[in-house]
Structures are given as C-alpha cells and as structure tokens.
C-alpha cells in the first residue's frame, strides 16, 4: 500500500458569527473532503508537544512522527537545508522575514507579500550592506529568507512576527533566553547574539526605507525580522523509521517544509507556479503528487494558502483556499489513485489552526481523515473540527498519527 498525506496548513479555525457560528471548514463547500471523512475513519490530533509554541515547523515534524524533544532546532536550519546551504558546525541559522512596520507597529509579517524576485533583490542588497565574515543573508522564498550567524547562540527568545500583528515592535526585539547560564567558548553569548540581531534589525530599517523598491511601492518591505534559530539537526530518515517506506517525496512551496523533507530523506519536488498563496499552482501540485506516487511509496503534499489567509485575517480568502484545496487537490488526487490496482491510503489534515479572528497559530487539536479503498468507515459524515471529535480514532497525539497511518495495509 502507498501512502499520501494532504496537509492544508492552518486550515482549522474557530466558529465565526458571520458564518452562523460555523467554522470555515464547516461552512465551505467541500464534497471531496467530506467524502474522505464519510467513507473513511476520522479523529483529532494534538500536533504540538508540551513546552513548544504552535509553529508549523513543530507541527509538521510531529505529524511525520518525530520526537520534537530530540530533533527540534528551529526553522532556520530546516530552511537552510531546503535552499542547499550547508551549515558548518558553529553556524546558527535563523529565519529572516522581511516585514512591514507602520507607526511603530508590525503591520504584517510578509512585507506586502513579496515575490521571490523582490525578496532576492532586497536580501542581496542587505547582504552587501550588512553582511561580513560573521553575518550572511541568504535568499529563500518570497518574504521568507535566511540569516546565518557564525558562532551564534541559539539560546535567545524571538517573537514570530505573524504572532504579533499590530503590536509595537520595539518590545518584541530579541532577548537572551531567560535562565540559560551555560557557557560555550565556541559560541558568542546569548546576550551578544541578541544584541547583534537587534542591531541588524535597526540598521535594516533605514537601509530598506531608502531603497528605490520601497519608494515606488504603497506597501513597504521595510524591516527584517529574525526568529526561530538553531544549529544543524540530527534526524533519522522516514525510511529508517518506517520499513513500509522505501522512497518518498515532499511537495511544498515553503522552504521550511522542504527542509523537514530533506532531513526526513524525502525527494524535494519543486512545482512551477507554486507560491504558497491562494494563487498557487494547485493542479501542478496535484499532478506532481500523483506522478510521484506512481514511482514511490510515500508523498507529503503540503498546501500553505489557508495559513496565509488566516494570518491576514481574511475570511473570504480562507474560505476560497479551503474550496480550492477540495476541488483542485483532494478531488484529482482521489480520482486518480482510487482507480489504481495497488491501494493508496490518503490522510487529510491541517498542522494547526490559524483562526482568522486571531490571525495567529493556536495550540488546539486538528481534525484528520484517513481513507483507502478497503477501510471500514466510522459514523462521521463530514470533515470539520466538530464532526471529527466523534471519529473512531479518538484523540491522538504527536507520533501516534504516523504510527497509526503507516500501520494501515
């Protein structure tokens, strides 16, 4: 049996008055998601371990069956792997957003949804102006880039910008980790690391404000914002962990997810036109997943758009991304693999909720559905946050999902 996970990032949500007390998943027209729930088995999943913030790097790593307490090193190292940057032993890699500040506050976490070409222009400019033997700016995707600090210390506290929309930015500057007292002579101190990053933030603002790109633009990409740093992780591959998987692929527009896939031993498939937004190439991603499954045992198909809509607080857009996921991802994948001689097991789930009224991730269980041709359905008939609480799988946590999924034969 082959296995595919279809993950709608941030797709889960809360009940919304405008939708008559329904969640976006309950309200949107999703016949194929509902089919998987009705003809399959469902449940709820805790994706965030105790002591961790509800980030996509945490949730997606847990969904794939890893113990975060053993492998977690933050987003930076994962994104470094995705873009082909070979981390050295004393490197600290940290995510570097390009964001928009206005009136002393974080207006958005994405600088007005930069294209990758626009982000590359600004990151190369910043590396020329601020980079040196200790500091290197590296282009990623869109507004999501990488900052590498030689001998940097990961024991710092950073504020993910998507968690703090409309908040004053100065109180959110980098701080040394409270209570951390160990000394490593190979690295600068947490305080020195925080000071260095804050200095780069301040200097980036004057440089970006005066860049011709921002002078001709209504939305401003006018500050960097580093967060989620760490060292090179040590992870076993999925093939080493699950004998059912001989080979597999990850399909995502997001460096973070590609980086997880890299360390998990998956091939990284890059789909032209995959943007991570509502305008992504859904058909191309579905087709790539189907073709990969013809040759391999496992595919992790990640769709980012609903998470971005949640962060923007855009309910109409979130509803649209959910409908698109149903009609342009779930439908073609199901219709293709359901006809194959070799059975394929499909799992559908988000990694975490990103409620539009909160505009950030929350640590709550998410609904999942698992279908294959011979499965005995439970009594759930629709796919959403409420219905799946009645599912036969009950409430699973962390690695239990992958263990359950891979045992299905």
List each model region and its residues:
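Feature captures the catalytic ectodomains and active-site-proximal regions of enzymes
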Residues: 1-409
């Amino acid at each position: 049996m082959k296995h595919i996970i279809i993950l709608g990032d941030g797709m889960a949500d809360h009940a919304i008055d405008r939708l008559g007390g329904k969640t976006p998943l309950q309200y949107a027209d999703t016949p194929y998601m509902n089919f998987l729930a009705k003809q399959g088995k469902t449940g709820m999943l805790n994706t965030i371990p105790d002591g961790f913030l509800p980030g996509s790097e945490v949730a997606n790593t847990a969904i794939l069956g890893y113990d975060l307490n053993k492998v977690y090193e933050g987003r930076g190292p994962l994104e470094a792997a995705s873009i082909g940057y070979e981390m050295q032993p004393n490197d600290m890699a940290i995510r570097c957003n390009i964001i928009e500040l206005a009136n002393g506050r974080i207006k958005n976490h994405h600088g007005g949804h930069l294209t990758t070409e626009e982000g590359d222009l600004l990151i190369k400019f910043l590396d020329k102006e601020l980079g040196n033997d200790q500091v290197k700016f590296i282009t990623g995707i869109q507004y999501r880039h990488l900052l590498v600090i030689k001998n940097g210390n990961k024991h710092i506290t950073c504020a993910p910008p998507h968690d703090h929309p409309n908040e004053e930015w100065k109180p959110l500057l980098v701080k040394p980790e409270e209570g951390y007292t160990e000394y490593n002579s190979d690295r600068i101190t947490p305080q020195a690391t925080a000071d260095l990053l804050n200095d780069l933030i301040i200097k980036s603002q004057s440089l970006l404000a005066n860049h011709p790109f921002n002078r001709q633009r209504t939305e401003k990409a006018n500050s960097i914002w580093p967060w989620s740093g760490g060292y090179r992780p040590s992870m076993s591959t999925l093939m080493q962990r699950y004998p059912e998987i001989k080979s597999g692929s990850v399909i995502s527009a997001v460096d973070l997810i590609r980086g997880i896939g890299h360390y998990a031993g998956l091939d990284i498939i890059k789909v032209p036109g995959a943007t991570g937004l509502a305008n992504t190439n859904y058909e191309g991603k579905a087709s790539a997943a189907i073709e990969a499954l013809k040759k391999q045992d496992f595919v992790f198909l990640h769709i980012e758009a609903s998470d971005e809509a949640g962060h923007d607080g855009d309910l109409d857009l979130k509803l649209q991304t959910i409908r698109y996921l149903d009609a342009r991802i779930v439908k073609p994948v199901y219709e293709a693999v359901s006809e194959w001689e070799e059975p394929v097991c499909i799992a559908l789930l988000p990694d975490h909720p990103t409620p539009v009224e909160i505009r950030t991730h929350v640590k709550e269980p998410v609904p999942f559905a698992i279908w294959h041709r011979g499965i005995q359905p439970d009594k759930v008939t629709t796919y959403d946050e409420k219905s799946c609480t009645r599912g036969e799988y009950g409430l699973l946590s962390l690695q239990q999902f992958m263990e359950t999924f891979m045992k299905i034969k």
